[in-house]
Regions:
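Short, solvent-exposed loop/beta-turn-alpha elements that line the ligand-binding surface or hinge
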Residues: 76-100, 154-158, 170-180
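A structural signal for short loop-to-beta-strand junctions that line the ligand-binding cleft
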Residues: 1-25, 53-59, 175-181
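Extracytoplasmic/periplasmic substrate-recognition and gating elements
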Residues: 5, 28-29, 154-201
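Glycine-centered hinge/linker elements that transmit conformational signals in sensory
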Residues: 44-46, 88-122
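Hinge/lid segment of periplasmic solute-binding proteins
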Residues: 1-17, 32, 41, 47, ...
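Alpha-to-beta junction loops
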Residues: 50-54, 136-144, 161
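A local structural motif
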Residues: 6, 29-32, 109-125, 138, ...
Length: 201
């Protein structure tokens, strides 16, 4: 990346947050992949009524995964342009669109138990647990990054169900169209005090 005209690092991998869903299950139930907040909450209620968790996910193995959900809600509710303005200091993180995003995430996560049934379950589950939950219809969907494609395919290898993915829905009227949030997963840099920067390059 470049900042203030200075080159700091080269991208190694690009990743995106996505919403995986059990395509076979959705077709069986006549559910549509949500693109708006109303559709999102409607299908979530239908999933819960069918005795399943809305999303499979957990943080036991890597607690910073909380930032993934925060980022999804900030961008889907406040919009990526507003998030960018906040990142460069042109907006305050206490502005209503950001507060609303976090309040909605709290409602869905704490009050409604969208992730693995409850906040307690979310904190207790690890990578293998929530992948198994998704593959076995314990949950109808999973919010995660594109780095999970291999593990998800392996989890469904012995299943007759098919899985697919879609962008996370827009959570506020007038927000941006559904989009895949692209980010750098890893970067390559050379220590500024390296004795042999050219050789390292």
């Amino acid at each position: 990346g470049v900042f203030n005209g200075e080159f700091y690092s080269a991208p190694k991998t690009f990743e995106s947050m996505i919403m995986l869903y059990n395509k076979t299950l959705f077709e069986e139930k006549g559910w549509s992949v949500p693109t708006t907040l109303a559709e999102y909450e409607d299908v979530a209620n239908k999933i819960k009524a069918a005795g399943m968790n809305v999303f499979a996910y957990g943080s036991t193995g890597w607690q910073p995964t909380h930032e993934h959900l925060v980022g999804m809600y900030l961008n889907s509710y406040a919009g990526p342009n507003n998030v960018y303005k906040a990142l460069i200091g042109e907006k305050d993180w206490t502005d209503p669109e950001f507060v609303g995003a976090i309040e909605l995430l709290r409602k869905h996560m704490v009050d409604d138990g969208y992730w693995s049934g409850s906040l307690e379950n979310y904190y207790a589950l690890g990578w293998d647990d929530f992948h198994a939950m998704f593959a076995s219809r314990g949950a109808a969907m999973m919010t995660i990054g594109t780095w999970t494609f291999g593990a998800t395919a392996a989890g469904f290898a012995d299943s007759s169900d098919e899985w697919d993915w879609a962008p996370f829905p827009v959570l506020r009227d007038g927000g941006a169209d559904p989009a895949y949030l692209l980010a750098l997963g890893t970067t390559m840099s050379i220590n500024a005090s390296s004795a042999n920067p050219d050789a390292a390059a």
